[in-house]
A protein has these predicted regions:
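Polar/acidic, low-complexity leader/linker segments enriched in S/T/G and N/D
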Residues: 1-17, 204-210
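Short polybasic amphipathic segments
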Residues: 1-8, 193-194, 237-239, 336
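Short acidic, glycine-rich loop/turn motifs
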Residues: 7-11, 56-68, 242-246, 338-342
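An acidic/polar, Gly/Ser/Thr-rich interaction patch typically located in mid-to-C-terminal regions
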Residues: 20-47, 168, 217-384
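Extended Gly/Ser/Thr-rich low-complexity repeat segments
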Residues: 44-60, 104-114, 204-219, 329-337, ...
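Surface-exposed cap/loop segments at beta↔alpha junctions
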Residues: 50-149
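Short beta-strand-centered interaction patches in the first periplasmic/extracellular domains
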Residues: 70-72, 76-103, 141-236, 244, ...
Length: 384
């Protein structure tokens, strides 16, 4: 494996001499991370600087567009720390995020009020706020939206909060549409591209004709496996309160995700007063029709409920000698089948996170299938 380093202008700066360890985490619905530990050498100290871009070359298949261009995931260094242990060994630690974190450099302005699919909404907000249709100061340089397969989806009545975080809104629409995203780099052309996609169906009974991908210790393609089934954070019915009308009445809508009753009914409240019925379009004040506004509140409710679902997940350490190869037979975002005969469990789930660990010349791959449990920070944000 080789780690290459670039400037933000995608000018090649060199390759890392050697590393002690690398943790490379990619996520389907969220921003990935990395953590790298390397001995201090003149070359490493020169390259591992805050702000530089790193890419990982390990011989695995990357994203290739129809024009033959090769795009790969990359990360930006945001943290550098130098340590010296009791034996006098000096090491350099670098940490950072995959490039989709750049989306949070922008607030959405002007406000978007639009009816479309989640895929179209994501492309629209990216294009308007950091793409070709953004103002000259707000454009990301060397950046474009990569060609995409059209994904089937229902129409959504959407309105964002004024000056909403672009990254957070893209994440919300991606989760609602079951879409993955990232910003990729083209080293040869010195370009960046917004990548929006939907993983393949590789489940045991898929109807698309794809070769099934089944992870099980019985097939010797999994070394370790953990299973989690949690309803600790589960809600299935939400009340959404909108902004006050001129008569001070506040409309309330509900979203019912399960048609449950009795003890099975789990209710939650969401205040959506940040979604106003009136907004500015140029110099004109526009009033959203009540029926459209209520549909927007329901969209907010559906988005909120996405974070309150049952958490069912497998976390597996995949054997590097297995019959299934990462990025050849399966990839981040694909839906696969997990099977554990002894536990009596078989589920179809999406690969939502992949952790690649490189240490002492050895590689391990750990994949999360399904939804991982929310962190304490995520729970606090939800309560707020």
């Amino acid at each position: 494996m080789e780690i290459r380093v670039f400037s933000t202008e995608v000018e090649p700066l060199g390759a890392i001499d050697e590393i002690s360890s690398l943790l490379w985490v990619t996520k389907y619905f969220d921003v990935g991370t990395f953590s790298l530990l390397a001995p201090i050498t003149e070359n490493n100290s020169k390259l591992l600087k805050r702000g530089n871009i790193i890419t990982k070359h390990d011989g695995r298949r990357e994203v290739v567009t129809e024009d033959g261009k090769i795009w790969r995931r990359a990360a930006q260094i945001t943290y550098v720390h130098i340590t010296k242990d009791e034996n006098g060994l000096e090491q350099l630690e670098a940490q950072g995020y995959m490039l989709s974190r750049w989306l949070s450099k922008r607030c959405i302005t002007p406000q978007i009020v639009k009816t479309d699919t989640n895929q179209a909404l994501i492309n629209f907000m990216v294009e308007k706020n950091c793409g070709s249709q953004a103002g000259s100061r707000r454009k990301f340089q060397r950046f474009s939206i990569l060609p995409q397969e059209k994904v089937a989806g229902t129409l959504v009545e959407y309105a964002n909060v004024a000056y909403a975080d672009l990254g957070a809104e893209v994440k919300g629409r991606a989760q609602a549409g079951k879409l993955g995203y990232d910003i990729l780099i083209n080293e040869r052309e010195k370009l960046y591209g917004f990548y929006l996609y939907k993983g393949k169906d590789l489940t045991a009974k898929n109807l698309e004709g794809n070769t099934p991908c089944i992870f099980s210790r019985d097939f010797d393609n999994v070394d370790e496996q953990e299973y989690t089934d949690s309803i600790e954070n589960c809600k299935n019915f939400i009340y959404v309160q909108g902004a006050a009308e001129e008569n001070e009445a506040q409309p309330v809508v509900t979203v019912d995700a399960a048609e449950a009753s009795g003890l099975e009914l789990e209710e939650v409240f969401c205040e959506a007063t940040d979604i106003a019925r009136k907004y500015q379009e140029g110099e004109t004040e526009v009033t959203i029709p009540l029926s459209t506004y209520l549909a927007m509140l329901r969209t907010r409710g559906s988005t909120e409920l996405e974070g309150y679902g049952e958490a069912v997940s497998f976390t597996s350490t995949i054997s590097t000698n297995s019959n299934l190869k990462y990025k050849s037979d399966f990839d981040l975002g694909d839906r696969i089948t997990c099977k554990e005969v002894k536990w009596g469990i078989q589920i179809d789930a999406r690969i939502t996170e992949v952790l690649e660990t490189y240490q002492k010349g050895e590689e391990t791959i750990e994949a999360t299938f399904g939804d991982s449990l929310p962190t304490l920070l995520e729970q606090i944000k939800k309560v707020r």
